[in-house]
């Protein structure tokens, strides 16, 4: 087991090998059982009506695809992300690397398992810094994929005609919400594009599921 300490959470992007590692850890499968409903019936007021519930939503799953593009090229992979109040499990599979990469986390401990072994750190940011030489604000992604800013603040938000988030800027990242889908009684982002310098990451959620928090 390899242990690393917690570094600064936002280091610079350096090479094509770096962005490949991004998907293995950052976006936390393509075998989703059903397609989401088309984004065609959002109304003004829907976002305000659900935002309080979104802010307290801490048990959900997301399955779909993630794509990355830098100056060096582009790739895509399948993603299966399960979030619980105190734990998360993110499985990345497909063309990235050989086989599967599994990221699991709980307070104070994050583990990444892939074909090269098992690696552990106190935070996902520290794990990325150790393995890739840079890191993302991973802890913020839990909020961004729900259409919310991370609670640390400093965000700038633009809304569309229906009052839903259209663009979010935070921690040097720009998150664009391109499409929405219905999950139970909530509207959830279906397609979002995140950019930071030369890095562009696109997440397409083929399936959202709201889970029991037990």
From Swiss-Prot:
- InterPro entries, per database record: LolA/LolB/LppX, OM_lipoprot_LolB
Q: How does it assemble?
A: Monomer.
Which residues are annotated with the lipid modification N-palmitoyl cysteine?
31
Write out the GO cellular component annotations: cell outer membrane
- Key words of the record: Cell outer membrane, Chaperone, Lipoprotein, Membrane, Palmitate, Protein transport, Signal, Transport
The organism's superkingdom is given as Bacteria
UniProt source species: Chromohalobacter salexigens (strain ATCC BAA-138 / DSM 3043 / CIP 106854 / NCIMB 13768 / 1H11)
What GO biological process terms are annotated to this protein in UniProt? lipoprotein localization to outer membrane; protein transport
Keyword Chaperone tagged: yes
Subcellular localization, per the record? Cell outer membrane
- Pfam families noted in UniProt: LolB
Query: What are the boundaries of the signal sequence?
Result: 1-30
**Protein name per its UniProtKB record:** Outer-membrane lipoprotein LolB
Protein purpose: Plays a critical role in the incorporation of lipoproteins in the outer membrane after they are released by the LolA protein.
Q: Describe its membrane topology.
A: Lipid-anchor
Question: What family does the entry list?
Answer: Belongs to the LolB family.
Q: Quick one: where's the S-diacylglycerol cysteine lipidation? A: 31
